[in-house]
Amino acid sequence: YIVGTPFGKEFAKKIVVDLKEAIITKENKISYINRKIDKNPQITIVGESIMSESLAYAISTEKNKTVNVISSLETDEKLLLKGDKIAMFEDDIEKCLKNSKTIIADPLFRPICPLDSNFISLPHEAFSGRIYRDEIPNIINKSL
């Protein structure tokens, strides 16, 4: 199997290559594993681990930005890159975000983000349910 969500054009291409390779090698692979982590990222993504890591890879590849992830749901740590975090409680997430410049997250996380941060709303049904369903963009195999 291949782990990853094909966000963006470049990451979608990488997943296709990884799938073809996995057919031949019979080895599982996490497609976003080679993304670079930065202690002071330009962007922080809060959300479910695989989708967030995939989006982080896509943004770092297509936009040449440093991106880190905070998984706000319980997840296997092997699905996160070293340096990314798991924070499931609001207080913990808020602490992780205190120095974040740009944050991509479900709109329900906005109240715990620093007031001076640039907040980019990315609704997810696991968090806000159907409230913002009409605002969920389709970024699969699309330029970011």
What are these regions (language model features)?
Residues 1-144:
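An N-terminal assembly and electron-transfer interface module characteristic of large anaerobic redox
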